[in-house]
Amino acid sequence: MNIQALLSEKVSQALTAAGAPADSEAQIRQSAKAQFGDYQANGVMAVAKKLGMPPRQLAEKVVQLLALEGIAEKTEIAGPGFINIFLDKQWVASQVENALNAPKLGLTPVEPQTIVIDYSAPNVAKEMHVGHLRSTIIGDAAARTLEFLGHNVIRANHVGDWGTQFGMLIAYLEKMQNENASEMDLSDLEAFYREAKKHYDDDADFAERARGYVVKLQGGDEYCRQMWRKLVDITMTQNQINYERLNVTLTKQDVMGESLYNSMLPGIVADLKAKGLAVESEGATVVFLDEYKNKEGEPMGVIIQKKDGGYLYTTTDIACAKYRYETLNADRVLYYIDSRQHQHLMQAWTIVRKAGYVPDSVSLEHHMFGMMLGKDGKPFKTRAGGTIKLSELLDEAYDRALKLIAEKNPQMESDELSALAKVVSIGAIKYADLSKSRTTDYVFDWDNMLAFEGNTAPYMQYAYTRVASIFKRAGIQEDSLTQPITLSDEREFALATRLLQFEETITSVAREGTPHVMCSYLYDLAGLFSGFYEHCPILNAESDDVRQSRLRLALLTAKTLKQGLDTLGIETVEKM
């Protein structure tokens, strides 16, 4: 049930009947205060201006024509022409019944789209670090959300698996006479990488050999390809451990690295030349874009092939967008890449559109995000200024959560303690990020994220456990609750209305790629349940009818909290 969509349709119909253009927007919003009703229609003023009539006069006409019988208890006109809508309690109760009995909490079925989500994208032969965290967990929340709604989601892990570094690594492995690369773990690879780079910088013969291996690798040399595949496999095996620890849904099957598009690059350069979009400039192949200007105010040149014949990231990104439309049949492509890459992506997509590789009907969206900062406001690093490995961050989160939970539950068995610490620690790291607007930088703070108060994962996980425990404590089975829901107390009504706003929330998250909206909703819902729980006795209600009604409200709250947290990739527990 999407109340906002229902009211938008009703108010739009009334606006049209009142003489407004057919495309007039109702602008339905959830009311900030109960005195203004449950929803407000704010579109009357803009429409009245177009029609050249007083807004309040149009609002009165719209209210007369509004068909909200059985949905709204009353409507009121406020100020210059706002329409406040007060929902009918019986109608809200009936919609809660529907949500409880229907699959997926009563969500309206969507028209399924094929949506490609580009996220995580670590580099081969390097261990994942905290810089990969935001893309990985925000992108995964988007994938889970869209999949839950019923879309066909294709996860694309655009790993950095191509380039000169592989020539260096293969050359160094050969130098060390270590062809048994399959037994290396990633920490060895990182050490190899550092040594290979040192040799590359210091030894001209080595550098020449490394460059030769790059050419051989690009030419399909079997020995080089075999070594390259080992490096990729070792890296992705290690990354998979991190993904599973993070409760992220990416698998090895989702890897679509840069190398996937190699065979497309010569054809794309030739095609862009043939279309007159790319030209030779100082030996390189360049696309000049009028949409972007250089410092002299001239069209900016985007290089797609270097003088030496090598290709650039832009060329790969053009091929990648083309592939996602032509081969994956994408209706929508979401890129979870940090904000520093914005201009680069926009330039690639401008070329893609001009070349006709992806039609305007297919949405290409950069869901950019800010940086992860330490308490000092600088990029989050080790005390020595180094990059923090993701595995080390997860280890520290687990240790901190274990200590905290052990202090609160000294009698808890060690196995249970360990399992709970895993769920709480991973939830804390993910929720701390997901609860902030992705477009802003955010400060990483252990104390805040592991707190059991405020908008944190431990608080939300506890909120779910608290609701679920009501049923466990009383030994109540869901199917034993047969009495209808009644909403006689204002707190019952407020909780019920907020429960019905789950679809509006998840629809917004799916449209904008903003999981913090879901976090805010769940935190608000937990707060409303807390007020309801304290003031409306559930197990000790005045009658069995009221008891069952309140238990059913509690049941939908538990289901909504659990499902909402699941779309964020955060697990719940039955006991805390």
Swiss-Prot record:
Entry GO MF terms: arginine-tRNA ligase activity; ATP binding
Q: What is its EC number?
A: 6.1.1.19
Question: One Pfam family this chain carries?
Answer: tRNA-synt_1d
Q: What GO biological process terms are annotated to this protein in UniProt?
A: arginyl-tRNA aminoacylation
Task: Look at the named UniProt entry and state the broad enzyme category this protein falls under.
Answer: ligase
User: Keywords on this record?
Assistant: Aminoacyl-tRNA synthetase, ATP-binding, Cytoplasm, Ligase, Nucleotide-binding, Protein biosynthesis
**Would the keyword Nuclease be found if you checked this record's keyword annotation?**
no
Short motif 'HIGH' region, span? 122-132
- What is the superkingdom listed in this entry's lineage? Bacteria
- Which InterPro entries does the UniProt entry name for this protein? aa-tRNA-synth_I_CS, Arg-tRNA-ligase, Arg-tRNA-synth_N, Arg-tRNA-synth_N_sf, ArgRS_core, DALR_anticod-bd, Rossmann-like_a/b/a_fold, tRNAsynth_Ia_anticodon-bd
* SMART domains (alphabetical): Arg_tRNA_synt_N, DALR_1
Provide the reaction this enzyme catalyses.
tRNA(Arg) + L-arginine + ATP = L-arginyl-tRNA(Arg) + AMP + diphosphate
Where in or outside the cell is it found? Cytoplasm
Instruction: Spell out the GO cellular component terms annotated for this protein, sorted alphabetically and separated by semicolons.
Output: cytoplasm
Q: Does the keyword Nucleus feature in the UniProt annotation?
A: no
Task: Share what the entry says about its subunit structure, partners included.
Answer: Monomer.
Which NCBIfam families does the entry link to? argS (TIGR00456)
Q: Which family does it belong to?
A: Belongs to the class-I aminoacyl-tRNA synthetase family.
How is this protein named in the record?
A: Arginine--tRNA ligase
